[in-house]
């Protein structure tokens, strides 16, 4: 990172990898990069058991890098595959099933205070 210009070049594989609410993620640009004052964060996520949830503040963009499956947005199922992009505004309950690698961009970055799991959801997400 070039401090004076707040520029970042980072390569997948040289990033923190961790279990998240939606699967395994590589933090490409994240809360650890606060000194950059990023307009958003970006994670590469291997979807695995993403539970229904929503955000009150953040918008999410999903771009399917590989694989496929479906995303559920406010109870409606949408098939996705490599090359699909999904726009998820604040307040939309969403989940994903299938085997896919997704670039997830949170605008602004999504913190734990803006993650709300939906516990009593009667929609069949399979």
Question: What do the PLM-derived regions correspond to, one by one?
Answer:
Residues 2-11, 19-20, 35-38, 97-126:
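Double-stranded beta-helix
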Residues 11, 41-43, 79-82:
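Short amphipathic beta-strand/extended segments with alternating polar/hydrophobic composition
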Residues 14-52, 58, 105, 114:
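A short glycine-rich, His/Asp/Glu-containing loop-to-beta-strand
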Residues 16-17, 53, 77, 94:
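Short secondary-structure boundary/capping segments
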Residues 49, 57-70, 74:
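Glycine- and acidic-residue-biased ligand/ion/polar-headgroup-sensing regions
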Residues 52-53, 71-72, 88, 92-99, ...:
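Short beta-strand His + acidic residue motifs that chelate non-heme Fe in jelly-roll/DSBH
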Residues 65-66, 81-82, 98:
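A cytosolic small-molecule/anion-sensing beta-strand core signal
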């Amino acid at each position: 990172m070039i401090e004076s210009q707040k520029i970042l070049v980072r390569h997948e594989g040289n990033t923190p990898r961790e279990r998240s609410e939606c699967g395994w993620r590589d933090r490409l640009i994240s809360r650890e990069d606060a000194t950059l004052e990023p307009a958003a964060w970006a994670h590469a996520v291997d979807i695995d058991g993403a539970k229904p949830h929503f955000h009150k503040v953040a918008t999410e963009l999903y771009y399917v890098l590989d694989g496929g499956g479906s995303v559920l947005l406010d109870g409606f199922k949408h098939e996705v595959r490599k090359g699909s992009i999904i726009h998820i505004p604040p307040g939309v309950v969403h989940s994903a099933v299938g085997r896919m690698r997704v670039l997830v961009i949170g605008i602004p970055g999504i913190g734990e205070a803006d993650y709300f799991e939906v516990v009593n959801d009667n929609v069949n997400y399979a």
